[in-house]
UniProtKB/Swiss-Prot annotation:
UniProt-listed Pfam families: His_biosynth
Catalytic activity: 1-(5-phospho-beta-D-ribosyl)-5-[(5-phospho-beta-D-ribosylamino)methylideneamino]imidazole-4-carboxamide = 5-[(5-phospho-1-deoxy-D-ribulos-1-ylimino)methylamino]-1-(5-phospho-beta-D-ribosyl)imidazole-4-carboxamide
Pathway: Amino-acid biosynthesis; L-histidine biosynthesis; L-histidine from 5-phospho-alpha-D-ribose 1-diphosphate: step 4/9
Natural source organism: Pseudomonas putida (strain ATCC 700007 / DSM 6899 / JCM 31910 / BCRC 17059 / LMG 24140 / F1)
Location of the active site: 8 (proton acceptor), 130 (proton donor)
Any one cellular-component term (Gene Ontology): cytoplasm
Name assigned to this protein: 1-(5-phosphoribosyl)-5-[(5-phosphoribosylamino)methylideneamino] imidazole-4-carboxamide isomerase
Family the UniProt entry places it in: Belongs to the HisA/HisF family.
Highest taxon in the source lineage: Bacteria
Gene3D superfamilies according to UniProt: Aldolase class I
GO BP annotation list: L-histidine biosynthetic process; L-tryptophan biosynthetic process
Amino acid sequence: MLIIPAIDLKDGACVRLRQGRMEDSTVFSDDPVSMAAKWVEGGCRRLHLVDLNGAFEGQPVNGEVVTAIAKRYPNLPIQIGGGIRSLETIEHYVKAGVSYVIIGTKAVKQPEFVAEACKAFPGKVIVGLDAKDGFVATDGWAEVSSVQVIDLARRFEADGVSAIVYTDIAKDGMMQGCNVPFTKALAEATRIPVIASGGIHNLGDIKALLDAKAPGIIGAITGRAIYEGTLDVAEAQAFCDNYQG
C-alpha cells in the first residue's frame, strides 16, 4: 500500500481544508514546490495534488504550480484533481508530465466522459468519488447527490479506470480515522483498485486499513496528519512495506 502525501492548492498556496469547506482552510506553505520536495525527500512514491480553486470554478486555476512540480520530479507519479472537466485539460496535464488525472464532479454528472477520457488517455484516468453517508457529493462537495458510491464505481469497471480515490467528507481534515468499513466494502465490490482518503491521523489508521485485508486498497492519501506531524511519511511507508498481518 502506498502512502500518498496530499498537496491542496488554493490561491497558489498549500492549504488544508476541514470537511471540504473553503472558508475553513489552514495555510501550511506559500511554496508548494518546496513542500513537494519535502515529501519526496521523505521517500514518498506518489503525490496527490488538488486544485481547490479549480474544483469550485470547473477549470484549472493552479495549473502552473502543478506543472512546476511535475517538471521538477519527472520520475515521480503525480495525480491531480480539481476542475478536470474536459479532454483539453487532461491533455494539458498529461503533456506537462502528470501521471494521472482525477475526474470527480464530471464523472458523477456525465459518466460517459470517463469512458471517453480512458479511451483518449489509457492508463491515465482516476475517478474521485467523494461521499457523505454513502452518497456521492459533487462541485467541491457543495452538492450531495442521490447516487450511491458503490453503484457508480461499478459503472466504471468496463472503462479502464486506473483507480478510485474514495474520500469520506465527514472524516476529511478531522483526523479521526478514515472510514475503513466502507473503504473495504468498496474495494471488495469493484474490480477497480481503491485509494483511501480522508481522516487519517496516525500509524494506527494505516494499520487499520492494512488489517482490513482488502487487496484492492492500493494506497492511502494523507494531508493534515503529515503537516501537523502526527504521521511520518517515511515511517508509514516502511510500516506498509513490512506489514505481515
